[in-house]
Structures are given as C-alpha cells and as structure tokens.
From Swiss-Prot:
The keyword Transmembrane does not apply. Necessary for efficient RNA polymerase transcription elongation past template-encoded arresting sites. The arresting sites in DNA have the property of trapping a certain fraction of elongating RNA polymerases that pass through, resulting in locked ternary complexes. Cleavage of the nascent transcript by cleavage factors such as GreA or GreB allows the resumption of elongation from the new 3'terminus. GreA releases sequences of 2 to 3 nucleotides. This is Transcription elongation factor GreA. It comes from Paracoccus denitrificans (strain Pd 1222). The keyword Cell membrane does not apply. One of its GO terms (molecular function) is DNA binding. Disulfide bonds: none annotated. PROSITE patterns: GREAB_1. SUPFAM superfamilies: FKBP-like (SSF54534), GreA transcript cleavage protein, N-terminal domain (SSF46557). Residues 46-66 form a coiled coil.
Amino acid sequence: MEKIPMTRAGYDQLDEELRELRSVQRPAVIRAIAEAREHGDLSENAEYHAAREKQSFVEGRIKELEMILSRAEVIDPTRLNGSIKFGATVTLVDEDSEEERTYQIVGEAEADLERGLLNIRSPLARALIGKDEGDSIEVVTPGGGKSYEIISIRYV
C-alpha cells in the first residue's frame, strides 16, 4: 500500500479525532440507539433512524482514520532544507495583485487552505515542488493562469 505523507501535527490531529470518535461519539450513538429503541415501533421512529445514520457516519469515519493512520509516513520538516518539498513553508507573492501568501505543503488528509495547509497533490503545490527562492511559477486554475514569485522557503 502507498504511504500517506503527513506532518507530526497532522498525524496527531487525526489521531485525536479517532480517539474522540471511539471514546465519546461511538458510545453516545450507541446510547441514543438504545434510547430510541425503547420508544417502540422502529419503522416510524425518526430518532432511531437518525441515530443509526449517525452511527454509520461515525463508524465510517473511524475506518477511514484507521486506514489513513496505518499508512501514515510522518515526515519531520525541521530535518529538511533546500528546494521546496513536502513540509516546506513557502511564502509567495501573486505577481498580478502583489498579495503575499504563506502555505505549508502537507499531506492530503491534513490539508486546510483556510489555515494555510496546502495539499501536496494540488496544482499549486505540484508547481512549487523542486523550486527555489526567487523562482517564479505559473499555475493554471479554473479562473485562468496565475503567476507567483517564491519569496522564502522555511522548514519549521
């Protein structure tokens, strides 16, 4: 099976979510199902069906997290340097708007653009891999092409 690269912070976040699902949410759903069963006829019991649906979601997410964490390859970005690779924190300037943005290149399971965590498989991350400070890149987006200049690369 293919390894899933991720940072220690990303691994810890997913592991904490898994613990929460197993120790808090799963038991709560089981209690909700038991309570709903006490109300009698299950065929028209909305509480029962809602609890079963929630159980399905919780169990599915537990399986997904177990699979991701079993295949995880934790990479320590502080041990890296040089050109851009997984784990790099990159500051870019949009060459059109002059807007500065900072992203850390992370694994798919921990990506969150709002927090500046860029999926390594995204078009922007793929364009950045292997580049150095001062390089310019072109990225094709649904809204058209964008040009960025790489201002800094850090491994933190």
